[in-house]
Design a protein with these regions (language model features):
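An acidic intrinsically disordered interaction segment
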Residues: 23, 28-45, 128, 147-151
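A generic structural signal for ordered alpha-helices
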Residues: 10, 27, 31, 43, ...
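Internal, Lys/Arg-enriched amphipathic helical interaction segments that engage polyanionic partners
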Residues: 1-36
Length: 187
């Protein structure tokens, strides 16, 4: 149903939202939860937290759902990073620097890059994406540039901005749209 749409605009936003909500049924969301439950990547202690977030979503308690998922995102990024390292993937600073430059063309690459930073770990996923493991580049771009943003212009975004939510700056995230975007980001 989305085929005729090449982009989202004010004119077609409601139509696209209707199609997405129609597709993302309770059964669809339960399927995602089942996949998370069967995941060998995520820390097992994280699963009950994610289950509670989905329960809140199903009860239309969107502030709670988004808050939980926003707080879990960085931990999930680290879970994936640790799994990749456990499988022998090497962390190449040069690749991370190149990814940093492509995401931040207006900024100078820092001389010190923190390996344990979730944003750095995401950049490492980009450098590893050519092998097709887990993430598509556009998904990582969305998480890096939108979800993990600290830009003031995103204070009341239609996206769930993790840093803005967790620091009490973004206050408009109690919507079905924010909650569904949070769930799909985790997935």
């Amino acid at each position: 149903e989305l085929v005729p749409y090449t982009s989202i605009s004010e004119e077609n936003k409601d139509e696209i939202s209707t199609i997405v909500y129609k597709f993302c049924t309770a059964e669809f969301i339960d399927g995602l939860l089942m996949d998370w439950n069967n995941s060998t990547v995520m820390d097992r202690k994280r699963i009950p937290i994610l289950q509670e977030a989905i329960s809140l979503y199903n009860s239309e308690l969107y502030y709670g759902c988004v808050s939980i998922l926003a707080c879990q995102l960085n931990g999930i990024i680290t879970d994936i990073y640790n799994m990749q390292r456990a499988y022998g993937k090497e962390f190449d600073f040069e690749d991370v620097k190149m990814a940093y430059q492509s995401f931040n063309p207006q900024k100078k690459v820092p001389t010190i890059i923190k390996k344990d930073s979730e944003r750095t770990q995401l950049l490492w996923f980009i450098s590893d994406a050519e092998e097709g493991l887990m993430y598509w580049i556009k998904s990582i771009e969305y998480i890096y540039n939108i979800i993990l943003t600290s830009k003031d212009s995103m204070n009341q975004s239609s996206h769930p901005c993790r840093n803005k939510i967790c620091h009490g700056i973004q206050l408009n995230f109690g919507t079905r749209e924010h909650a569904l975007k949070s769930i799909l980001t985790i997935d």
